[in-house]
């Protein structure tokens, strides 16, 4: 009888131990299911039945520019996409886009125009989180935001040299991608603050990994690119290699791919620093090295990075979407 009672007691204790564990597993499973962004099972949502012109296989959308890379990544120009169709696809996925921008030291003066024009032209109709990194949080302007859009201010330290501010951007984005961004957004767009949005910049740019053609080199041969040419640097690219020259002021992709890019660039810069060398164009040099060997899945045309004051407005550019703001570089950087 004693053995029987002891056996029942053990069984009862076992049940008591299993029950909380089962509840914990079920709670965790439900949390994971709810947390999988853009991967919900069930009804795919309402589909837009709007009529649009049929794509014509024998009629290219643009014949004056390259629209496809050798690795089959599209190059995004005006006339190569249907934004209504793309908007519908990304809304069905309930996409949230993060836009990172660094407004450090005197560069905070550009933030108001940047945010105001972003509200007019950047990812209109989609959920957006602006991540503003600054050493002057009190100077961040109050800009009215549309529905589904919010601003997050994140405090960072400043550096004496503007080059160091630029290079440490990679470290900061890498850290926050892993610790925060991956829980809040689906895509990241990393932009310079001393710019303004002049025309539509939308979901046509979104992809696993995208880079933007430098407006000063999109017509040039690789021998003219200002890659880092010293073999001692981790950013080194030989003279006989290179696809395009990418601008460091506008890049992005999925959070995981941006994390990989920024982490690799930061680690390369740390190694260069240990060896007493600094790449010719700092983080941009390392960005170009990374995108040479980790091909972007989309390439943005210079419509998405232009300086009209320096380059005018050539006829090949049907739209100027993201443009430089006139400034005194020396006064701002010092």
UniProtKB/Swiss-Prot annotation:
Large intestine, caecum, stomach, pancreas, submaxillary gland and kidney (at protein level). Ubiquitous. Keywords: Glycoprotein, Glycosyltransferase, Golgi apparatus, Manganese, Membrane, Metal-binding, Secreted, Signal-anchor, Transferase, Transmembrane, Transmembrane helix. It comes from the Eukaryota. Residues 37-334 are lumenal. The chain crosses the membrane at residues 16-36. Pathway: Protein modification; protein glycosylation. Binds 1 Mn(2+) ion per subunit. Its main location: Golgi. UDP-N-acetyl-alpha-D-galactosamine binds at residues 102-104, 107, 192-194. An alpha-L-fucosyl-(1->2)-beta-D-galactosyl derivative binds at residues 214, 226, 284, 307. It is an enzyme of class 2 (transferase). The conserved DXD motif is involved in cofactor binding. The manganese ion interacts with the beta-phosphate group of UDP and may also have a role in catalysis. Belongs to the glycosyltransferase 6 family. Possesses strong B transferase activity and weak A transferase activity. This is Histo-blood group ABO system transferase 2. It comes from Rattus norvegicus (Rat). The lineage of its organism: Eukaryota, Metazoa, Chordata, Craniata, Vertebrata. The gene is Abo2.
């Amino acid at each position: 009888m004693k053995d029987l009672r002891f056996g029942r007691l053990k069984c009862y204790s076992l049940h008591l131990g299993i029950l909380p564990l089962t509840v914990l597993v079920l709670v965790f499973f439900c949390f994971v299911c709810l947390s999988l962004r853009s991967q919900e099972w069930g009804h795919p949502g309402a589909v837009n039945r709007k009529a649009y012109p049929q794509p014509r296989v024998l009629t290219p959308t643009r014949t004056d520019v390259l629209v496809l890379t050798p690795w089959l990544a599209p190059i995004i120009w005006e006339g190569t996409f249907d934004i209504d169709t793309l908007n519908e696809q990304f809304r069905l996925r309930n996409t949230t886009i993060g836009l990172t921008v660094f407004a450090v030291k005197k560069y905070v003066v550009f933030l108001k125009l940047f945010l105001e024009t972003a509200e007019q032209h950047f990812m209109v109709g989609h959920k957006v989180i602006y991540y503003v990194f600054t050493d002057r949080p009190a100077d961040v302007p109050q800009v009215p935001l549309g529905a589904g859009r919010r601003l997050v201010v994140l405090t960072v330290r400043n550096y004496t040299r503007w080059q160091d501010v630029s290079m440490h951007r990679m470290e900061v984005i890498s850290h926050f991608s892993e610790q925060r961004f991956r829980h809040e957004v689906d895509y990241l767009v990393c932009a310079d603050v001393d710019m303004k949005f002049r025309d539509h910049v939308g979901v046509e740019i979104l992809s696993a990994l995208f880079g933007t053609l430098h407006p000063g080199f999109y017509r040039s041969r690789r021998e003219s690119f200002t890659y880092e040419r010293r073999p001692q640097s981790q950013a080194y690219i030989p003279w006989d290699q290179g696809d395009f020259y990418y601008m460091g002021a506008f890049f992005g992709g999925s959070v995981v791919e941006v994390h990989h890019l920024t982490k690799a660039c930061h680690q390369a810069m740390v190694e260069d620093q240990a060896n007493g060398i600094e790449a010719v164009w700092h983080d941009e040099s390392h960005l170009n090295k990374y995108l040479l060997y980790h091909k972007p899945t989309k390439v943005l045309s210079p419509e998405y990075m232009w300086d009209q004051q320096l380059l005018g407005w050539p006829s090949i550019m049907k739209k100027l979407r993201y443009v430089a703001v006139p400034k005194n570089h020396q006064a701002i950087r010092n």
